[in-house]
């Protein structure tokens, strides 16, 4: 059994792991190291802070000190880990080092910012810390450009619109949520955003940004320009892999782990947004919760593989919320779409008429759990 566990990170994945370890072992030494304050907040709330008038500090649910006391932890906030000596089992920062028996990387993912001229003018909303840095600018902004029409971009577009701001959403795809579902399924939400006043610029690409006396000038294709007060990058996340790479671990899109959450080094594990589990990056709450339960057991001497069921993904767009599950991005599915006033049920079936995916909206979201049971594992 491990004598000491060091966790790098303090987000949802790290906290779920701590809670699951402490359910089974109240005394094993646990050390958490992170670059942020280590205060707890609910990250999905960032998609709704503007319409709800919340400040960054309003999001805090539990301070780092309260967390440490509740779960008997050693915490090192505002600490940048610079290196991992995997052979010596040592984690290093500029001024400190920690010995470990088992190490867990829960370093999360960072928001991708498109590499265009003026990219430094783009804001990101991937953490409480990032929101704190730009909350005044976002609150005061009348005109907002959101770059990226995926899950987060669609949520933010609706939220800023509900807050009374003039919102433009740009994406190079022909429809919103293009990486998650086909246009015939996402069209209901797309129409709702348009009805609310969101200006959609699809099949368009941002060319550059420039600061002006009255705001930010965004140049699009064909030399078209629009002026806004704030630009938000919502073009996806990139797993944080730099530390793992320096430690000599196997990296692909994320830190590669097997069904036991173990990396290419037997005493180092990865969890959450930074992990690539058997080739899959799963930056959603449910797989992280299930992964944390399994990893806690394995760190305490068990040998339990992770088995993920079909899981719901929730798109938090309050005027037209969606739940989806299964292989919604598959190109070969045939979609059977039933639309009523109270909502939509879209079923994606394969050539054998086997249900492989579904999307439900509004009041018909209550049908999700029944459909979930019929999806293949």
Curated annotation (Swiss-Prot):
It catalyses: 2 reduced [nitric oxide reductase rubredoxin domain] + NAD(+) + H(+) = 2 oxidized [nitric oxide reductase rubredoxin domain] + NADH. One of its GO terms (cellular component) is cytoplasm. Pathway: Nitrogen metabolism; nitric oxide reduction. SUPFAM superfamilies: FAD/NAD(P)-binding domain. Keywords: Cytoplasm, FAD, Flavoprotein, NAD, Oxidoreductase. It comes from the Bacteria. Its cofactor is FAD. Its EC number is 1.18.1.-. One of its GO terms (molecular function) is oxidoreductase activity, acting on iron-sulfur proteins as donors, NAD or NADP as acceptor. It is found in: Cytoplasm. Pfam families: Pyr_redox_2, Rbx_binding. PANTHER family: NITRITE REDUCTASE [NAD(P)H], PYRIDINE NUCLEOTIDE-DISULFIDE OXIDOREDUCTASE DOMAIN-CONTAINING. Belongs to the FAD-dependent oxidoreductase family. One of at least two accessory proteins for anaerobic nitric oxide (NO) reductase. Reduces the rubredoxin moiety of NO reductase. This is Nitric oxide reductase FlRd-NAD(+) reductase. It comes from Escherichia coli (strain SMS-3-5 / SECEC). The gene is norW.
């Amino acid at each position: 059994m491990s004598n000491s566990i060091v966790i790098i990170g303090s987000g949802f994945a790290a906290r779920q792991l701590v809670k699951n370890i402490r359910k089974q072992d109240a005394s094993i030494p646990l050390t958490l190291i992170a670059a942020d304050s280590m205060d707890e907040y609910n990250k999905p709330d960032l998609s709704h802070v503007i319409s709800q008038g919340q400040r960054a500090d309003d999001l805090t649910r539990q301070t780092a000190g309260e967390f440490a006391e509740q779960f008997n932890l050693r915490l090192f906030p505002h600490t940048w880990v610079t290196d991992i000596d995997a052979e010596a089992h040592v984690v290093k920062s500029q001024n400190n080092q920690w010995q470990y028996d088992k190490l867990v990387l829960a370093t999360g993912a960072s928001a991708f910012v498109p590499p265009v001229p003026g990219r430094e003018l783009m804001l990101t909303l991937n953490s409480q810390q990032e929101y704190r840095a730009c909350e005044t600018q976002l609150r005061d902004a009348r005109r907002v450009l959101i770059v990226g029409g995926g899950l987060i971009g669609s949520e933010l577009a609706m939220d800023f619109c509900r807050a009374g701001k003039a919102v433009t959403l740009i994406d190079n795809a022909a429809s919103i949520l293009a990486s998650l579902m086909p246009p015939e399924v996402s069209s209901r939400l797309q129409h709702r955003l348009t009805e609310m006043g969101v200006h959609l610029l699809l099949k368009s690409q941002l060319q550059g940004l420039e600061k002006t006396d009255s705001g930010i000038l965004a140049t699009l294709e064909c030399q078209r320009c629009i002026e806004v007060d704030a630009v938000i990058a919502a073009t996806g996340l990139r797993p944080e892999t730099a530390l793992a790479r320096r430690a000599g671990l196997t990296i692909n899109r994320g830190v590669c782990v097997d069904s036991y959450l173990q990396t290419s080094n037997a005493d180092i594990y990865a969890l959450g947004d930074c992990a690539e589990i058997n080739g899959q990056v799963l930056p959603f709450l449910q797989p992280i919760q299930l992964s944390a339960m399994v990893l806690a057991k394995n760190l305490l001497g068990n040998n339990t593989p992770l088995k993920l069921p079909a899981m719901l993904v929730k798109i938090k767009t309050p005027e037209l919320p969606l739940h989806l599950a299964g292989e919604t991005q598959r190109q070969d599915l045939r979609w059977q779409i039933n639309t009523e006033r109270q909502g939509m049920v879209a079923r994606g079936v394969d050539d054998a008429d086997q249900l492989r995916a579904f999307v439900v909206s509004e009041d018909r979201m209550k049908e999700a759990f029944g459909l979930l049971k019929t999806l293949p594992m």
